């Protein structure tokens, strides 16, 4: 009887139990970590990339950039960064056109959390939701704007020193080359390391000094804080001037389907208005 019962368990109606997957050993798990990081979507914008509403989010970002998000005290991003993302070089407001959405998202969140010191920006973005930030970040990441005029004083004698710090570093004082993180000619290493080529001298000097005195502390492992604190004033001026003299990168033309109303935003439009191109 017992033999018949066991035979019935091996019948098609009772297939034998399947073996489960073999457990992953610890050393195998460590090998999978780099692969996991490569395929992991960038924080903050993964939803935007996957839900099929990218065009709508960019259009929302364009609206917030022009008018704010509707909360009391909310100011349009274009008031300072301009609708073309060119910023205001004369007063050190950075260009954000063409920066990666991941980086812009991270920096706005940093202002909200207090890891990036900016009293004015903190008032502007304090009521921004993550969806608002995602939309604005996506919008400005698609904008392409030629370099604006930087009225800062240019000292030709500083250029060789700035180039040396940028490209070779000052290893005798444990100061690495800037291009190791910010890319060849300051073009950035997307998505996490921003381009700094073509930023204004005033802005770059402000940020290096902000890292040096730990007003800004959103750098991974305190890397920029450690570097900035070792630079002398003349070296800060030199490296800021060098990168300000370079041309900002263009990561490609705006895909038509991602550009609301197919706008081309040009630096002459500093009054927050757009110009349609044919």
Identify what each model region corresponds to:
Residues 1-25:
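N-terminal secretory signal peptides that target proteins for export/translocation
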Residues 29-40:
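Bacterial N-terminal signal peptides
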Residues 46-73, 142-171, 269-278:
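Electrostatic cytochrome c docking/interface patches
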Residues 56-114:
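The feature marks the first
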Residues 62-78, 101, 167-179, 194-206, ...:
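Sequence context surrounding c-type heme c attachment/ligation sites in exported
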Residues 74-83, 136, 175-185, 239:
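The canonical Cys-X-X-Cys-His
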Residues 79, 88-95, 110-153, 190-195, ...:
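Axial heme c-ligation environment in periplasmic c-type cytochrome domains
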Residues 257-272:
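A short, charged, Gly/Pro-tolerant segment at domain boundaries
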């Amino acid at each position: 009887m017992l033999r018949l019962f066991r035979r019935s368990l091996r019948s098609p109606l009772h297939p034998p139990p399947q073996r489960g997957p073999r457990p992953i050993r610890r050393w195998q798990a460590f090998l999978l970590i780099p692969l996991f990081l490569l395929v992991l979507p960038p924080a903050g914008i993964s939803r935007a990339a996957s839900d099929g509403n990218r065009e709508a989010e960019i259009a929302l970002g364009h609206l917030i950039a022009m008018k704010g998000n509707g909360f009391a005290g909310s100011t349009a991003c274009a008031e300072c960064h301009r609708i073309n993302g060119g910023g205001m070089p004369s007063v050190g407001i950075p260009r954000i056109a063409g920066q990666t959405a991941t980086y812009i998202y991270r920096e706005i969140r940093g202002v909200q959390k207090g890891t990036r010191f900016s009293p004015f920006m903190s008032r502007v973005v304090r009521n921004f939701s993550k969806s608002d930030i995602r939309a604005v970040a996506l919008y400005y990441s698609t904008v392409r704007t030629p370099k604006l005029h930087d009225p800062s004083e240019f000292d030709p004698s500083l250029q060789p020193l700035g180039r040396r710090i940028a490209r070779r570093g000052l290893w005798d004082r444990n100061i690495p080359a800037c291009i190791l993180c910010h890319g060849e000619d300051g073009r950035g290493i997307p998505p996490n390391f921003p381009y700094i080529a073509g930023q204004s001298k005033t802005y770059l000097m402000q940020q290096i000094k902000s890292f040096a005195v730990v007003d800004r502390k959103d750098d991974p492992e305190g890397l920029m804080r450690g570097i900035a604190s070792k630079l002398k004033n003349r070296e800060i001026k030199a490296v800021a001037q060098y990168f300000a003299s370079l041309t900002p990168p263009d990561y490609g033309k705006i895909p038509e389907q991602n550009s609301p109303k197919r706008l081309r935003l040009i630096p002459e439009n500093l009054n927050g208005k757009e110009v349609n191109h044919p």
